[in-house]
Amino acid sequence: VSAATEHGPDGSRLLGRTVPIRAYNLFRAISKYPQLLPQMRSTFLDVLVERGLLSREELAAAAKARVEADGLPAARETLADYTDALIDMAFAEWLSADEVENYINLVRKRDRCQELGRVLSGSHATAETVWRALKEFCDIPKGEIYISPEEAEGIRVSLLSFYVSSQLPFLGIAKKYVTIRDISAILEHTLGHVAYPGRLGGKAAGMIVAQKILLPILAGHDPDFERHIAVPDTWFISSGVFSDFIDRNDFHLFHTHKYREREAFDAEYQLIGERFESASFSPDIIAQFRRLIEEIGEHPIIVRSSSFLEDSFGLAFSGKYQSVFLANQGDVEARLAAFVRGVKTSLASMYGPDPIIYRRDHGLLDYDERMAIIVQKVVGRRLGDYLFPFAAGVMYSRNCYTWSPKIRKDDGLVRLVFGLGTRAVDRVGGDYPRMVPLSHPL
């Protein structure tokens, strides 16, 4: 537009103070995204109208007046070009540079959000295509203006279902606390297979949601205490690695093991463990394991199970699967070999007698169970060549040990021990656990 600088009855009063460099900077910024120009102009105009800075009628009159002043025919295309230019100039005039950038990024986020939703809803979605679409969304600066709650909630549910857990009770809670960018951050610490989407399992799901709910509450109510509460450095191995391992080594018949008679479980499970021990992961997975071991360094770790059913609503599976502690000392190859053995042990525990009997007792035997893995640094203090974990425990939402009428069952119970958590789960004989009713903890 040649000049929209004078005031007058043609509707250009709001365009009279435009600083040319600001309008030019805005146009240069939005020109980087030519496919989004219509959406950006539409958003800009909506903002101007909502703030009472410009009406649609005023804009149309200003565009028509400028076309006539320049001696051009009032063709539809010409009017559209002038209208777009006047929107840009008005937006640059009335909004700060930071606001302009926020609204440009809002349009970009909406566009990438729609693409992410399209990929997630497709029947051929893979871990790679979803991750690429998610990363494109998260690469856009967060800014101070967000996509609508409805858009965000739909994408959150789809991502959580795709990557973490599809259980409806979990999704109903997690979608309120776990953001799209949170999921991206989790995946930055996830190992997986490109051909198998996989999920992170029930234990991982519970950890993620508990962290997102509890830490902000502590920060708001007791910041001094919150400083001492931290989630250990954590990595996830998705169930896609388990699926690839089963396919690669032709272990599909092991899925029928759960239908055998109880007397055959122990011998069969020992055979499965031996077969897992001699089996191999794909070279790509081993390469990911090696990078993880190098990243962790020489620090003790725990390899933890996270099956789809584990720690789900109404189903604890406490102590049913194997967790493996590793000293993780020495050269990389030795640590890698020990890590691979630990992962195999944890994966094989899905076929153990305890979880299968538990599933049978709860009517879950026909469920297509899968296993993911959580890898965490062991928390403790070093003393010479040793690492001493301070304390661990198991928390129950219902307290069945009410040794006093004052204790409220529904407030829960903590079984607290010194040292590693296995002492709380396995109830080691001769140990000294502390049973703490949460209704009366002191």
Give short role names for the model-derived ranges:
Residues 1-176, 182, 291, 300:
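N-terminal, non-catalytic alpha-helical interaction modules of very large eukaryotic scaffold proteins
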Residues 21-24, 38, 42, 76-84, ...:
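Non-catalytic, well-ordered alpha-helical scaffold segments
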Residues 37, 55, 68-71, 88-102, ...:
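Alpha-helix initiation/capping motif
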Residues 152-222, 276-442:
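Conserved mixed alpha/beta core segments that line enzyme active sites in large multi-domain catalysts
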Residues 214-242:
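Glycine-rich phosphate/pyrophosphate-binding loops
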Residues 231-259, 263:
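Terminal amphipathic helices with adjacent charged low-complexity linkers/tails
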Residues 262-284:
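Metal-assisted phosphate- and nucleotidyl-transfer catalytic regions
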